[in-house]
């Protein structure tokens, strides 16, 4: 699914971004969001 990381949680590398939910590791109860446009831009956000 899609995700946004401008206001939903602490950014890991680059923010803001819009992307897709990745299966990468974040803390329990959080999910990783990876940017559509940059392979290194990602963040963790609280699961909805």
Curated annotation (Swiss-Prot):
Compartment annotation: Secreted; Nematocyst
Chain's role: Binds specifically to voltage-gated sodium channels (Nav), thereby delaying their inactivation during signal transduction. Its toxicity is greater than that of RpII (AC P01534).
Cellular compartments per GO CC: extracellular region; nematocyst
SUPFAM superfamilies: Defensin-like (SSF57392)
Keywords, ordered alphabetically: Disulfide bond, Ion channel impairing toxin, Nematocyst, Neurotoxin, Secreted, Toxin, Voltage-gated sodium channel impairing toxin
Lineage of source species: Eukaryota, Metazoa, Cnidaria, Anthozoa, Hexacorallia
Cystine bridges: 3-43, 5-33, 26-44
Recorded family membership: Belongs to the sea anemone sodium channel inhibitory toxin family. Type II subfamily.
Pfam families hit by this protein: Toxin_4
Coiled coil (residue ranges): none
Species, as recorded: Heteractis magnifica
Protein name as annotated: Delta-stichotoxin-Hmg4b
């Amino acid at each position: 699914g899609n995700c946004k990381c401008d206001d939903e949680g602490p950014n890991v590398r680059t923010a803001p971004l819009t992307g897709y939910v990745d299966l990468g590791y974040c803390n329990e109860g959080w999910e990783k969001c990876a940017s559509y446009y940059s392979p290194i831009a990602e963040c963790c956000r609280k699961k909805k």
